[in-house]
């Protein structure tokens, strides 16, 4: 099989296509959560904390000089990204937990009852017991 043929076979497998769909949906979900955090949650947290805008929080290491921008550590953006991550991680945890609860546990095989002995065996057992007496 040629290199291109092997690649087509690989690319058309169900797992690869499922993974591609998952990546696209995950990217879209990430954008939604980022918007939720940046546009809804963090402004509310900012109002609660006294009007703090988290995207403006930074430590200036070197001031701007002669057209060179200032060197800063933008820890406010980091806090916002950390909240973003926590929400996504919690959502993934909930989805995995729901999937695991929906999985059916394999039914335990029933223990087979031993078959009743045949009539001639029962009769022979009774004769043996009588002879022992």
Curated annotation (Swiss-Prot):
Major location category of this protein: membrane
Subcellular location: Cell inner membrane
Bilayer topology term: Multi-pass membrane protein
Superkingdom assignment: Bacteria
Keyword field: Cell inner membrane, Cell membrane, Ion channel, Ion transport, Membrane, Transmembrane, Transmembrane helix, Transport
Transmembrane segments: 10-30, 76-96
One Gene Ontology cellular component annotation held by this UniProt entry: plasma membrane
Gene Ontology MF term list: mechanosensitive monoatomic ion channel activity
Subunit details: Homopentamer.
HAMAP family: MscL
Chain's role: Channel that opens in response to stretch forces in the membrane lipid bilayer. May participate in the regulation of osmotic pressure changes within the cell.
Family, per entry: Belongs to the MscL family.
The protein, known as: Large-conductance mechanosensitive channel
Gene: mscL
């Amino acid at each position: 099989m040629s290199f291109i043929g092997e690649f087509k076979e690989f690319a058309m497998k169900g797992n690869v296509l499922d993974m591609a769909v998952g990546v696209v949906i995950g990217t879209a979900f990430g954008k939604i959560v980022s918007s939720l955090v940046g546009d809804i949650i963090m402004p509310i947290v900012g109002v609660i904390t006294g009007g703090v805008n988290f995207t403006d929080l930074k430590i200036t290491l070197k001031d701007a000089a002669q057209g060179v921008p200032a060197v800063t550590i933008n820890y406010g953006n980091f806090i916002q990204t950390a909240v973003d991550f926590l929400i996504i991680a919690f959502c993934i945890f909930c989805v995995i937990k729901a999937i695991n609860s929906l999985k059916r546990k394999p039914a335990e095989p029933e223990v087979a009852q031993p078959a009743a002995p045949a009539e001639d065996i029962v009769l022979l057992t009774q004769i043996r017991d009588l002879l022992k007496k």
